[in-house]
Each structure stands twice: as structure tokens, then as C-alpha cells.
């Protein structure tokens, strides 16, 4: 099951290549044949931020990770910072480490996080808080201060959406001109890692009454 999930994940990330159909092929280091185009990520340097799904130390060489497949298919150089068990509140730390060690040489960043937020029953929360403020405005008359409601992003590690707000803000500040790809949590099957770590499949709610769908939809709203 896990192997199939990894393969599906990698295929989805590489879908721009697949969508070109039969007239499109991955070009190697040799010149492309007429009618073929090179995948835009071919030969690029990509940072991976995540949890056990990307952690190079998790399961060793027994299970290939998504970045292994992309390295093979697209000759990508992977900079992997995923750590097993981490949640969205670890994104800033991993991003800082990526920036420190590779700076501007990274071409794109992939974030695959969220399944542990669900499993740990982190409340989904809301994106914004509203408050009344005065703002200068004019609509065909002399400008003046008006009182209007304003929405402000909630920056808190107490909720899932608050963590995403913090993580994305951090990534944009560190890598303002880089492509950032957010991937949703994968489907969850029953996972038993011992007497004190048994995770039911996705047909069950977590302890705060949410299905994994809510965590998937939250990330989809960021796109």
C-alpha cells in the first residue's frame, strides 16, 4: 500500500510531463528530438520539506521515497529535510536549514506535510480574524478616514491553518522568487507501530472530530 502511494504521489507531481501525451517525452542530456519538449523540472535542484514520507532515514532503502523517483525520472538533485513525525509547525525550521545549507541554488521547494497534524488532532482553525480599523479611502470625493472591517491572517501554532499561515509566510520570505509546491496529505490506511502507536484508517475521525479531508481541503485552499 505504501509503495503504491509513493508511486501515485510521484506520478501526480510529474503530471505536467504526462499531460503532453504521446508527443511529449522526457529529454535527457542529449538534444531533444523534434516534437518533444523537456520537462521544466529536468535537472533542477529541489528542496523537500516534510515528515516520514520524505525522511531519508525512515525505512532506509526498503521503500523508495517520492524524491527517489523524481531523481531517476527527471535527474533532479534532491535536498531532503523531512523528519519522521513532524507537523506543519516544523516547516519554518526545515526551511531555515534549507536556506542555510543551499541558499539561492535551490530551484523549487516541495512541502508534503499534514498527516501528522491530523493524527495528532490539531484543530483545523480558520485563516483570518476580522477587526475594525480606520483606513484612508475616497470614491469620487475628498479622501477621508473610514472605519472598515479588515481580515488579518491568524499566525498561531495552535491550529492547522495558523501553522500553514506561519509556514508559508516563512517560506515566501526566505525564497521569494522560488516555486513552492504544496502537496496534500496522502490517503491513510491502518498503521500499527506498536502498542502505543496505532493509527486508524481514514474512515475514522481524529480526536477533534475531523476527517482527514478537512486537512486536505485546507491545503487545497492555498493554491
Predicted regions and their residues:
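Active-site-proximal beta-strand/loop segments in catalytic clefts of secreted hydrolases
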Residues: 49-52, 81-86, 112-115, 183-187
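Generic structural signal for helix capping and beta-alpha/helix-loop junctions
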Residues: 56, 88, 189-190
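Alpha-helical cap/lid subdomain in secreted, periplasmic
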Residues: 73, 94-223
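Structural motif
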Residues: 86-96
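Amphipathic coiled-coil/heptad-repeat helices and related helical stalk/stem segments
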Residues: 31-32, 63, 91, 164, ...
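Bacterial N-terminal signal peptides that target proteins for export
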Residues: 1-7
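Hydrophobic h-region of N-terminal signal peptides that target proteins for export
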Residues: 11-20
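Serine-esterase "nucleophile elbow" of acetyl-processing enzymes
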Residues: 21-82, 95-104
Amino acid at each position: 500500500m505504501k509503495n503504491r502511494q509513493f508511486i501515485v504521489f510521484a506520478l501526480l507531481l510529474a503530471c505536467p510531463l504526462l499531460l503532453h501525451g504521446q508527443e511529449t517525452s522526457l529529454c535527457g542530456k542529449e538534444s531533444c528530438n523534434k516534437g518533444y519538449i523537456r520537462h521544466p523540472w529536468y535537472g533542477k535542484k529541489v528542496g523537500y520539506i516534510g515528515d516520514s514520507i520524505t525522511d531519508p532515514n525512515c525505512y532506509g532503502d526498503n521503500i523508495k521515497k517520492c524524491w527517489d523517483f523524481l531523481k531517476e525520472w527527471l535527474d533532479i538533485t534532491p535536498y531532503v529535510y523531512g523528519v519522521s513525525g513532524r507537523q506543519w509547525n516544523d516547516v519554518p525550521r526545515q526551511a531555515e536549514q534549507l536556506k542555510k545549507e543551499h541558499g539561492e541554488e535551490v530551484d523549487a521547494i516541495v512541502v508534503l506535510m499534514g498527516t501528522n497534524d491530523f493524527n495528532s488532532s490539531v484543530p483545523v482553525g480558520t485563516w483570518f480574524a476580522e477587526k475594525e480599523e480606520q483606513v484612508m479611502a475616497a470614491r469620487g470625493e475628498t479622501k477621508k478616514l473610514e472605519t472598515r472591517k479588515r481580515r488579518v491572517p491568524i499566525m498561531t501554532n495552535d491550529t492547522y491553518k495558523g501553522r500553514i499561515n506561519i509556514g508559508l509566510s516563512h517560506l515566501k520570505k526566505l525564497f521569494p522568487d522560488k516555486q513552492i509546491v504544496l502537496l496534500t496529505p496522502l490517503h491513510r490506511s491502518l498503521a500499527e507501530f506498536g502498542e502505543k502507536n496505532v493509527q486508524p484508517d481514514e474512515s475514522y475521525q481524529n480526536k477533534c472530530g475531523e476527517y482527514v479531508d478537512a486537512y486536505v481541503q485546507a491545503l487545497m485552499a492555498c493554491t
